[in-house]
Amino acid sequence: MAVGKNKKLSKGKGNKKRAVDPFTRKEWYDIKAPVFFENRNVGKTIVNRSQGLKNASDALKGRILEQSLADLNKDDEQAYRKFQLRVDEVQGRNCLTNFYGMSFTSDKLRSLVRKWQSLIEAHQDIRTTDGYLLRVFAIGFTRRRANQVKKTTYAKSSQIHAIRKKMFEVIQRESSSCDLREFVAKLIPEVMGREIEKSTQGIYPLKDVFIHKVKVLKRPKFDVNKLYELHGGASVVGAEDVGTKIKSGEFKEPVPQASV
């Protein structure tokens, strides 16, 4: 057997490199929701500090954040609605967000499905007045008529087609004549769902009619002034970072002191 050094038994190096906590290189930023939500302080997000050519604001822009409407509007009954917010601008330590979508939680959608009824779904692409292309998804369920004895409430195919056509008409009418801010204002109290329920009474009575999902397919060219309007104006957003201009004639040279 050859005599040699056993590599497995060799001693390791005495000076090991000390592990650096990665959180020492990171910073926390506040997330601000648009003004159409009651609670504008959504939370915080973390990012690596600006270093060299890498800017922290560039890493933050484009982040998609998901928040429950119960936290945004301080209403626990709306916990099943999830709103997506996209970071479009960074001012100081504040991330200014804009609406980027909405969806229902899976447990809420599953709780709506029942036996002995018909499920009717529809989706349509609409364009707001300020250039956003949105895909709106609606859902509804048939219910019993007044004094109905029959257990089932199945709708015929012709009735389902007629109800879906009414859904298209209501979504187009309520969405195409408003901008994104007005659209979200209609989305939160479920204005379109109630309109669909009213307009389809003559075809077949519906219940649990909701706009359960909204996707942003296309956004207009980014305008920072419009984003500031969604956050209460530029002077409100960056109040802590903007100084006051000194007018000419206000500065007075201090009187020199005799002793220090």
Curated annotation (Swiss-Prot):
One Gene Ontology term from the biological process aspect of the record: translation
Subunit structure: Component of the small ribosomal subunit. Mature ribosomes consist of a small (40S) and a large (60S) subunit. The 40S subunit contains about 33 different proteins and 1 molecule of RNA (18S). The 60S subunit contains about 49 different proteins and 3 molecules of RNA (25S, 5.8S and 5S).
Disulfide bond sites: none
UniProt-annotated location(s): Cytoplasm
Name of the protein: Small ribosomal subunit protein eS1
Keywords, ordered alphabetically: Acetylation, Cytoplasm, Ribonucleoprotein, Ribosomal protein
Record's keyword annotation contains Cell inner membrane: no
Gene Ontology MF terms in the entry: structural constituent of ribosome
A GO CC term attached to the entry: cytosolic small ribosomal subunit
Main location group: cytoplasm
Residues annotated with N-acetylalanine modification: A2
Domain of life: Eukaryota
Similarity comment: family membership: Belongs to the eukaryotic ribosomal protein eS1 family.
